[in-house]
Amino acid sequence: MGLLDITDLIVFYENAIAINNINMSFNKGRIIGIFGANSAGKSTLMYTISGIILDVKKKEEMKGGERITIMGNILYDGQDITSLEPSERARRGIVLCPERRRIFIESSVMENLRIGGILATKRQAKETLDYIFSLFPTLIKLRNRPGGFLSGGEQQMLAIGRALMAQPEVLLLDEPLLGLSPAMEDVVTDAIEDINKDRGITIVLSLIHI
């Protein structure tokens, strides 16, 4: 049994199957890559592990939209979290950095980071903030700039930093290299390796290419 175990997971939208009977086990402290083409179900898997798929399902049901069916089980550290809300999963240490980054474009870099650390203690927030700035020194000079005025690469650094402020034990990175220049891909890739090595965080990332 790993830190995170997925058993017989099936997710389908109306008649389209997004995830078909997946069984996976992620060991603690590892970097796990999930590779696939567009529309292969990578984002759906990330949303399902983080629990955000449950919010999407509720919204679709409320507006009479697309029906989403989820079957199977997800165990985290031996506990069944299949029905837990995403906020509770985040409190337990499962944090998603989504493909579209979803930073607050009118808020500054510092404000975005503080929002990410809302559940952290003051000591945790300060230590993590110092670590983020050592990981991404560029964010220091950009700390007062609104998120909407950052480049794609700068937004990705901020999104990863904000996720770290939430004190994850499992960090889900959905397409962290999407739309980045080769140079910025190297920066982000190096940062992912450093985060895993320095903080022992289990990292699951989805990628279209290697």
Regions found by a protein language model. Give the residues of each.
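ABC-type ATPase nucleotide-binding domains, specifically the catalytic core motifs of the NBD
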Residues: 14, 53-61, 107-127, 135-137
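Helical segment within the ABC ATPase nucleotide-binding domain
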Residues: 186-200
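A short, proline-enriched helix->beta-strand linker immediately N-terminal to the Walker B motif
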Residues: 165-169
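ABC ATPase signature
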Residues: 107, 149-150, 163-164
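Conserved structural motif at the start of ABC-family nucleotide-binding domains
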Residues: 4-6, 18-19
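ABC ATPase NBD Q-loop/coupling interface
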Residues: 59-88
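The feature captures the beta-strand-to-loop junction immediately N-terminal to the Walker
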Residues: 35-37
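Conserved small/polar residues in nucleotide/adenosyl-binding loops
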Residues: 208-210
